[in-house]
């Protein structure tokens, strides 16, 4: 269970921040220097736009895992002229040395590994709280919590009863945080909502929330869906998870993956990368899917496609990757074999019904690793309390693949900040030529040399020599 981290530093002056240990800043700065060498997309944007400063005047509220790679993103936004306030989008994902380095550089950061839910929502509020009457005019989000906070808070200003019936611990903390803010500032959220020019959203779960708001007519500003840029979803979600999933599992448990039976629930891009990683280390991998197309893809790759109900007692390693909730429910959990490893690489902790386990005996083995005794007497190993295993138990995706994602984020922030008035309150994706530009920026680093079309070849397939090369409908 989460308890507050023991050591927190807070300084108020030219910059306010909350981090676990500011003395870790020098260590963080050394790792930032290494990461910069692995993030050619972001560094190219600094070179290209550093003099122009297209984000001058942007006040960005950032809610995204406070990692070393995110530190490079933050400093790129600042180099391009933005003011930034930052919180993590997950209670376990912060790398404390990264937070310290960015805070020491003068950026207000509110993040530490092992936040309580109350702290989490307090920190998310902190990125919305700017000096004077100012608030953020841009949101950079991962999972939709910052965006959702502004919108739910605005609803609560008009009708406080929307906060009357929290359904879980997360909502209890969220609703209490909103009520506390409204007790001192009754128009806080609506003021912020009016000045937001747009939001850029990093991940599948947050994008789903945005499309639902659009469908319901509740999206109050334009949004760019960064997740569905090809250079994000087909790289971060697939190749990033292929490396970081097993990193998290092995750091947490030290188990031999070879010879184990693993079940990946969900075979989207995240599930595909997760399945590859487990198979690559010698596990027998099964897939559970609701989508017939994804299920057929899995079967054609040689995976056995199964129902969780039919195989739950056989599985050594469970990985959820769906973006849905309670895909592993209480009935599944109590049937698991002794020492089964249970993990999630989707966004939220409700993919696994962790709440239903609270009445059982928990033994904390080390941070983010818990032994839970079931009624059968079997014990399961729950990783990161059902939150993101790759960030809770390891350090997330490698720098190079995050450079793809974060280059898209910077381009999306520039687009909405400079041209937000030309967008309706809908969800958009970046155009194909920018997607291809992001890819180009990363080729030299890995020694990839592009072939060039002749004019005759370009004319034959009816594309410009310099691209874009594919239609918007093309599926990579």
Curated annotation (Swiss-Prot):
Which Gene3D superfamilies does the annotation name?
Adenosylhomocysteinase-like (3.40.50.1480), NAD(P)-binding Rossmann-like Domain (3.40.50.720)
- Any idea what this protein is called? Adenosylhomocysteinase
Q: Which PROSITE patterns match?
A: ADOHCYASE_1, ADOHCYASE_2
Which organism was this protein described from? Prochlorococcus marinus (strain SARG / CCMP1375 / SS120)
Catalytic reactions on record: S-adenosyl-L-homocysteine + H2O = L-homocysteine + adenosine
Question: What taxonomic ancestry is recorded?
Answer: Bacteria, Bacillati, Cyanobacteriota, Cyanophyceae, Synechococcales
Task: Quote the function comment for this protein.
Answer: May play a key role in the regulation of the intracellular concentration of adenosylhomocysteine.
Q: Name one GO molecular function term.
A: adenosylhomocysteinase activity
| Compartment annotation | Cytoplasm
Which key words are in the record?
Cytoplasm, Hydrolase, NAD, One-carbon metabolism
């Amino acid at each position: 269970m989460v308890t507050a981290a023991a050591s927190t530093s807070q300084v108020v002056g030219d910059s306010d921040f909350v981090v676990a240990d500011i003395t870790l800043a020098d260590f963080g700065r050394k790792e930032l220097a290494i990461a910069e060498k692995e993030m050619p997309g972001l560094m190219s944007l600094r070179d290209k736009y550093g003099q122009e400063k297209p984000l001058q005047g942007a006040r960005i509220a950032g809610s995204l895992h406070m990692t070393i790679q995110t530190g490079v993103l933050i400093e790129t936004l600042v180099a391009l002229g933005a003011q930034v306030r930052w919180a993590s989008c997950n209670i376990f994902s912060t790398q404390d040395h990264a937070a310290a380095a960015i805070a020491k550089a003068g950026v207000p950061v509110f993040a530490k590994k092992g936040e309580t839910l109350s702290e989490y929502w307090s920190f998310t509020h902190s990125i919305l709280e700017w000096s004077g009457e100012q608030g953020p005019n841009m949101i950079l989000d991962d999972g939709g919590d910052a965006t959702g906070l502004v919108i739910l808070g605005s609803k609560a200003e008009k009708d406080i009863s929307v906060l009357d019936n929290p359904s879980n611990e997360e909502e209890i903390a969220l609703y209490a945080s909103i009520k506390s803010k409204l007790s001192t500032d009754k128009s806080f959220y609506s003021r912020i909502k009016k000045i937001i020019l747009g939001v850029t959203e990093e991940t599948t779960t947050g994008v789903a929330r945005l499309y639902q708001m659009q469908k319901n007519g509740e999206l109050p500003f334009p949004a760019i869906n960064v997740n569905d840029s090809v250079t994000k979803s087909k790289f971060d979600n697939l190749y990033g998870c292929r490396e970081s999933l097993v990193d998290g599992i092995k750091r947490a448990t030290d188990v031999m993956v070879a010879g184990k039976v693993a079940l990946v629930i969900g075979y989207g891009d995240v599930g595909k990368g997760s399945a590859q990683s487990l198979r690559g280390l010698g596990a027998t991998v099964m897939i559970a899917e609701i989508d017939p197309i994804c299920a057929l893809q899995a079967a054609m790759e040689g995976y056995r496609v199964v129902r969780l109900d039919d195989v739950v007692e056989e599985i050594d390693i469970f990985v959820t990757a769906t973006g849905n909730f309670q895909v592993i429910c209480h009935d599944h959990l109590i049937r698991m074999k002794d020492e089964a490893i249970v993990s999630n690489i989707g966004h939220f902790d409700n993919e696994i019904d962790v709440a239903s386990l609270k009445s059982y005996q928990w033994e904390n083995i080390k941070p983010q690793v818990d032994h839970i005794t079931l009624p059968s007497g079997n014990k399961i190993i729950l990783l990161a309390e059902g939150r993101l295993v790759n960030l809770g138990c390891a350090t997330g995706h490698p720098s190079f693949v995050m450079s793809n994602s974060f280059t898209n984020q910077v381009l999306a922030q520039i687009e909405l900040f400079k041209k937000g008035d030309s967008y309706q309150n809908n969800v958009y994706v970046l155009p194909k030529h920018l997607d291809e530009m992001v890819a180009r920026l990363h080729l030299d680093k890995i020694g990839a040399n592009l072939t060039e079309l002749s004019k005759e070849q370009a004319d034959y397939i009816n594309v410009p020599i310099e691209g874009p090369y594919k239609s918007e409908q093309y599926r990579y």
